Amino acid sequence: MANLQSKSSSAKRKRRHFRVRAKINGTTSVPRLNVFKSNGHFYAQLIDDVKQKTIVAASTLKMTGLKSTSNIAAAEKVGDEIAKKALDKKVTTVVFDRGGYLYHGKVKAFAEAARKAGLKF
């Protein structure tokens, strides 16, 4: 008989991420904007998949003045910071890789803040 138990949410996220990564690829001119959420922090990085190098990165690890490092406001702050760093490196257009997360809550707030700060995707 087939296993009828549902898979964990992290396993579902990993499946979604592999499916999305098969379709998108970052280049030097249009890098991939990747996000990762942990229980305590929010991370983002611009990746050139051709050279396999991280161009810029931002996270809540070293941010000060935040009430919480894992809420929507923190994600928006990371979105602003990654956009400013990307524009300093002359990167204006990116491909958004939501990391298998649903486009809702922190991920959506991050994306909207990055767009508002000047990134195009």
UniProtKB/Swiss-Prot annotation:
- Molecular function as annotated in GO: 5S rRNA binding; structural constituent of ribosome
Q: Does the keyword Ribonucleoprotein apply?
A: yes
Q: Which InterPro entries match?
A: Ribosomal_uL18_bac-type, Ribosomal_uL18_bac/euk
Q: Carries keyword Ribonucleoprotein?
A: yes
Alphabetized, the UniProt keywords read: Ribonucleoprotein, Ribosomal protein, RNA-binding, rRNA-binding
**A Gene Ontology BP annotation from the UniProt entry:** translation
Q: Gene Ontology cellular component? A: cytosolic large ribosomal subunit
Which function does this protein serve?
A: This is one of the proteins that bind and probably mediate the attachment of the 5S RNA into the large ribosomal subunit, where it forms part of the central protuberance.
Instruction: Describe its partners and assembly state.
Output: Part of the 50S ribosomal subunit; part of the 5S rRNA/L5/L18/L25 subcomplex. Contacts the 5S and 23S rRNAs.
- NCBIfam families hit by this protein: L18_bact
UniProt record similarity statement: Belongs to the universal ribosomal protein uL18 family.
What is the name of this protein? Answer: Large ribosomal subunit protein uL18
Organism encoding this protein = Spiroplasma kunkelii
The root-end lineage is: Bacteria, Bacillati, Mycoplasmatota, Mollicutes, Entomoplasmatales
Tell me the name of the encoding gene: rplR
